[in-house]
Amino acid sequence: MTQNHNIPTAIQIQNPINNNVSVTISDQLPKPSANNPNLLSVDTRPTHRKGHHHKHSLSHQYFLPPKNRQPLEIPASYPIPTFKETFAILTFPQKLKLTSSILFFLVAVGVLLSGDATILLTLSCSLIVEGVLIIINVWRETLDSFLVWRHTCLRYPFGMQQMELLVDFSFSILLIFLGMNLLKEPAEHAIEDWGNLHHAGDHEEETVHIHLTISLFASAIISGFALLLDHPSAHIRELNSRFFHGLTLVPSLILVLLLSLGYQVGSFLSHLLSLTIAVTALVNGFSIAKSLALMLLLTYSNKEKVFECVSLIKEDTRIDQLNYAAIWQPHYNTCIANIGLTVSGGEREQAAVREDIIRIIQKTVGSIFGAGVQPKWEISVDIQRA
């Protein structure tokens, strides 16, 4: 007796996770062959789910381990040189400059003790300023050889060269007080002369001694040699030692020339030269202090150029909005410009806008220093698509 069994023509397996996904085994599959009787082919469809649903599957690992990242290119810090290390790398010309600074101090004392004229006090102060400037320049050149001075690190983003700004700012304040003190001396002498007009003939001319001529000649000689041997630096900085060497050299040569011709250094000429040096030191110190204060406050010195640069950027019709614009100067040789824009164009238009903005910055605020050595500009343009 033959029993009829209902053989299913297809087996449909319902996915317990998604009811819409099923796997069907049809009776239209190829028949198993004699060589491989147990072969069973499964129809693979795009909706077929591969893998498994165990708890250790990658799809269930919500907290994956972090990817291997390269170490930071910027180090945390550089070793700070000690005084012994700084003195060990001094070259022979630098040691010679330090020795000449001591000579400046000795000549300043000799000029001050050689007479009572006001110009002698002024020249002695000017010689002291030259000696201090020589020490600062040697210190600056020596520290420039270390990595921590100009290289960027996390502890010092712009290097330790920003100490240079603090030292120069302190020196400019010293120049201001020195100029005010030198202005006070001729004013006091003028008031005394006006109060004692009937004794003016007794103090019209000051006695000239041989050591006065020697002191003035020595100050002229060392200032002249310092002016000739002082090469201009390749870096931009506010304090120019050549200017101060010339400020001492010119009055010394004038006084030596007058003394050699037989003229005595009268009070009028003494006060005139003293006032000239004092006013020059005061004006120069104030201008240096103002520009360095703006650098220390992380701003830019020329506001008109900054406004011109921002207005030129806003005039570009391709720019939808200027989000921010920050232009500042952290050091003599470094200027930073950060610009944020919103542009609706594609990648090519964004690249063209970025190049035009860099060109505008270099033509406006980047050219205020004139010819010669220019500061290094770090320009970043952040463009967002509208």
Swiss-Prot record:
List keywords of the entry alphabetically: Cytoplasm, Ion transport, Membrane, Nucleus, Transmembrane, Transmembrane helix, Transport, Zinc, Zinc transport
Q: Which GO terms describe its molecular function?
A: zinc ion transmembrane transporter activity
Looking at the UniProt entry, the stretches that span the membrane are 102-122, 128-148, 163-183, 208-228, 243-263, 268-288
Q: Where in the cell is it found?
A: Cytoplasm; Nucleus membrane
**What does this protein's UniProt record list under function?**
Probable transporter involved in the regulation of zinc homeostasis.
Q: Which family does it belong to?
A: Belongs to the cation diffusion facilitator (CDF) transporter (TC 2.A.4) family. SLC30A subfamily.
Q: How does it assemble?
A: Interacts with cis4.
User: What name appears for this protein in its UniProt entry?
Assistant: Probable zinc transporter zrg17
